[in-house]
Amino acid sequence: MSFANMFNKLSGQPESYEKKSLYRFGRTLGAGTYGIVREADCSSGKVAVKIILKRNVRGNERMVYDELDLLQKLNHPHIVHFVDWFESKDKFYIVTQLATGGELFDRICEYGKFTEKDASQTIRQVLDAVNYLHQRNIVHRDLKPENLLYLTRDLDSQLVLADFGIAKMLDNPAEVLTSMAGSFGYAAPEVMLKQGHGKAVDIWSLGVITYTLLCGYSPFRSENLTDLIEECRSGRVVFHERYWKDVSKDAKDFILSLLQVDPAQRPTSEEALKHPWLKGESASDRDLLPEIRAYIARSRLKRGIEIIKLANRIEALKMQEEDEEDIPSAVDVQASEASDKSGLSPFPALSTENSNTHPASTGNGESGGTKKRSLSKIARGAIFREVVLAKVREMKENEEREKVEREARERAHS
């Protein structure tokens, strides 16, 4: 037995903890309800390491083991690859393939151009991954743009599906799941209504993603859960003429088929893959976001991304109280504002898999309390600054939009 193994055993560390020495941890890539994701170097190159605090999943450890079990069974070009896992006394470490190309919507904002044909090819990649999961009776339950990542910065990079934290493997194809799961704006009506759900929830989420890809905004825009439920239950999906006049009929038909209120009326993943729109024959090559629409779409997407980044930053500040070794300083977190994302969902807002919140610091004595209060001030200051900056940006964007619209009207009348 090596000295390191002996020390780990004496300090109460699990046997697998010795694997941690194989990784050199770097920047923080994301933060969420249960932990953070950090970049790390190992002998085979760069990887992503999801670090989950055990105290945050106490009583729900099964959720972590289910994720590990799932990841080890998956092998698909459009699903992030599992590498390894290990644990310490107080954390789980899940090592996966590192996606450095950024989120799907980051790419749209960056290039400012996205054709219907691009959207068709993108959705086909995602649906291929979903179909692979559904054939194995696995429901992802948290499909959203933030969990769709490009592997590299190359223009022809593969898109991969990430974050299987609340995915479930069904005992049989007809099994009904009853726990709340998903993210606000993407969860299916049957999830929000607690009516029981299955594979069809992924199809609904994909419908929301497809709609958003084609116009830059969501088909359901309510800001609270009650109104969102009513909006989704109505079954009314509007294709506003101003933004949808150049989008093919096949694209709209595809979206409507996925956004059926009755889950039994939605196509299966296999059926959806056969839809004419995914063949790309009817999809247009014309840029979907020209002039005013491009500006509006980009500004909306950027605001959404900024909200996610703010949430990540705040969560990382909270996590600072938990562990100094694995969690970087607030300065490090802010410095990674423009960094690549990984598969840790920042907003599993509807999930009831684990009702625990981040516990307060357990530091003893006056100094511990002082540190806790100091971090709270940092968090409050960060929130205030970001809200003010977001408001200023929004005012400027509104002014610019009004200017562009005014000039467009003047050109139309000239």
Swiss-Prot record:
Protein keywords: ATP-binding, Calmodulin-binding, Cell cycle, Cell division, Kinase, Nucleotide-binding, Phosphoprotein, Serine/threonine-protein kinase, Transferase
Disulfide bonds: none
SMART domains according to UniProt: S_TKc
Coiled coil ranges: none
Gene Ontology cellular-component annotations: cytoplasm; cytosol
SUPFAM superfamilies assigned: Protein kinase-like (PK-like)
Recorded family membership: Belongs to the protein kinase superfamily. CAMK Ser/Thr protein kinase family. CaMK subfamily.
Protein name as catalogued: Calcium/calmodulin-dependent protein kinase cmkA
Species of the source: Emericella nidulans (strain FGSC A4 / ATCC 38163 / CBS 112.46 / NRRL 194 / M139) (Aspergillus nidulans)
Lineage: Eukaryota, Fungi, Dikarya, Ascomycota, Pezizomycotina
